[in-house]
Amino acid sequence: MMQVLSIQNCATTKENPSSGKLIVLTGPSGVGKGTLMRSLLQRHPELYYSVSATTRAPRPGEVNGESYYFISRNKFEELLAQGEFLESAEFAGNYYGTPREAVLNQIQSGKLVVLEIELAGARQIRASFPEALSIFILPPSFEELEKRIRGRGQDSEEAIARRLQRATEEIQAADEFDIQIVNDDFEAALQAIEVALFG
């Protein structure tokens, strides 16, 4: 049985949350992280989902403040310089970052906080919060991943090639994370995440 550990002795951060729990969900673009996260939150409203900030344009159906905080590059760089992000990374030419204050407040109040972030950001979180539980979502195959990315119909061939190259590199990092879950059968993958979080 998997147990999610409380965050304690975060020696590499100024903050020292001791009562909450931090969960990091990551994996390559197109693997289904967002869909899994949405379903997880629908089933477990007690979870606190940290909404990331990004400089990329909204995709169809995305809502500002729910899917992401959509902000300008200048605003992002200003917040970054002020130390307002717990982690930040650049992906496909856009910045992504996790607002620091909201996450730390929720952890300190005893909440289970879940982050859905890119690999570079997940590595930053692991360095700052070694007690965090990290979950890496894998595709059933590289061919399926390419099919999913192409199925979005949003990227040029050049952008797709970049995403696939990056995915190859990211998949090689899966073993760095506490748990690896293959998103082949959606319901099974979702249940595996629930077991990791709740036992």
Swiss-Prot record:
Gene3D superfamilies: Guanylate Kinase phosphate binding domain, P-loop containing nucleotide triphosphate hydrolases. It holds the Pfam family Guanylate_kin. GO terms for cellular component: cytosol. Its main location: cytoplasm. The keyword Metal-binding does not apply. ATP binds at residues 27-34. It is found in: Cytoplasm. Its EC number is 2.7.4.8. Keywords: ATP-binding, Cytoplasm, Kinase, Nucleotide-binding, Transferase. The keyword Transit peptide does not apply. Residues 20-198 form the Guanylate kinase-like domain. It catalyses: GMP + ATP = GDP + ADP. GO terms for molecular function: ATP binding; guanylate kinase activity. Essential for recycling GMP and indirectly, cGMP. PANTHER family: GUANYLATE KINASE (PTHR23117:SF13), GUANYLATE KINASE-RELATED (PTHR23117). This is Guanylate kinase. It comes from Trichormus variabilis (strain ATCC 29413 / PCC 7937).
